Regions:
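Interfacial segments of alpha-helical transmembrane regions
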Residues: 1, 62-80
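Hydrophobic alpha-helical membrane-embedded segments
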Residues: 1-11, 78-91
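Interfacial loop at the N-terminal end of multi-pass membrane proteins
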Residues: 1-49, 97-119
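Core segments of transmembrane alpha-helices
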Residues: 43-54, 74, 132-137
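Structural signal for the C-terminal ends of transmembrane alpha-helices
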Residues: 57-62, 145-146
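Conserved, charged catalytic cores of large soluble enzymes
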Residues: 94
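A hydrophobic membrane-anchoring alpha-helix module
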Residues: 126-150
């Protein structure tokens, strides 16, 4: 669920933003609001899923089941989106925030094309960030299926 919601931002929302404004200041404002809502909900979902994986891992470890490490790995893969955001995406985020702040003060010297290029780069960094919860989900699913089949 987290991955699908996250991917929809890059593949649906960002193109809609591109197609509905021709003012760089408006595009920056829309991106800022998108980021605001995304940063509230997406990490919370990721932390919740990570917590569930770690809870399952702890339960399996307590019952001496070897599969616990796979659930822990699923949790670790899922939460890796947080350091990725802080390390890899922060420079792009900060550039967009600076441009957005500049646009709030008055007319900006940045062109629509420049803003679109930065947001396009951000959208692809965001797609890469989606890989972490997806991998976590796949590891968790495969672990569950293997355990359910009695292996």
């Amino acid at each position: 669920m987290t991955t699908g919601a996250m991917l929809s931002i890059s593949f649906i929302t960002v193109p809609v933003l591109y197609n509905t404004t021709d003012a760089p200041s408006q595009l920056l404002k829309q991106w800022s609001r998108l980021y605001w809502y995304g940063h509230i909900y997406m990490p919370a979902m990721s932390v919740a899923v990570t917590g569930l994986f770690f809870y399952i891992a702890a339960q399996k470890r307590a019952s001496k089941k070897d599969i616990w490490s796979r659930y822990a790995m699923a949790g670790a893969a899922t939460i890796t989106m947080v350091p990725y955001t802080l390390i890899v995406m922060a420079p792009t985020n900060n550039s967009l925030f600076a441009l957005s702040d500049e646009a709030l003060v008055g007319p900006s010297s940045v062109s629509l094309k420049e803003v679109q290029e930065i947001i396009f780069g951000w959208a692809w960094l965001h797609v890469a960030r989606c890989v972490f919860p997806f991998v976590g989900s796949m590891i968790g699913l495969m672990s569950f299926m293997q355990e359910s089949m009695g292996h």
